[in-house]
């Protein structure tokens, strides 16, 4: 069974607008390239811990023989993604924390 995949990145950032601007720039750049299953990103602000944010990057299946998680791994290996990761770390207050999830249920199907 092919499932969507989400990478959750928990970060601390003193300038969330800059973080969101960078992610919007990333999304715009990805709209014109081979994005390897990339479906989009959401940024959530923690209501209980100011300055803490969760970035959720969603990936879907493009080729039925390649899982969405493998699509995400391919995306992470791209030079553009690695360069963006370096830039993003420069605006963070601490190292990001990564978590990986397979989608098992979705209401909009």
Regions flagged by a language model, labelled:
Residues 1-2, 109:
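Basic/polar N-terminal segments that are highly enriched at the extreme N-terminus
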Residues 4-12, 54-56:
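Active-site-flanking beta-strand signature of metal-NTP-handling nucleotidyl enzymes
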Residues 11-23:
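Short, surface-exposed ligand-recognition loops at beta-strand->loop->(often short) alpha-helix junctions
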Residues 15-17, 47, 61-63:
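Feature marks short, surface-exposed loop/turn motifs that line or immediately flank catalytic pockets
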Residues 28-40, 58-99:
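An amphipathic, aromatic/His-enriched active-site/gating alpha helix that lines ligand/cofactor pockets
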Residues 44-50:
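A short beta-turn/loop motif at secondary-structure boundaries
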Residues 51-53, 63-66, 107-108:
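Short catalytic/ligand-binding loop motif for oxyanion handling, primarily in non-cytosolic enzymes
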Residues 99-109:
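Short, low-order "capping/linker" segments at domain edges
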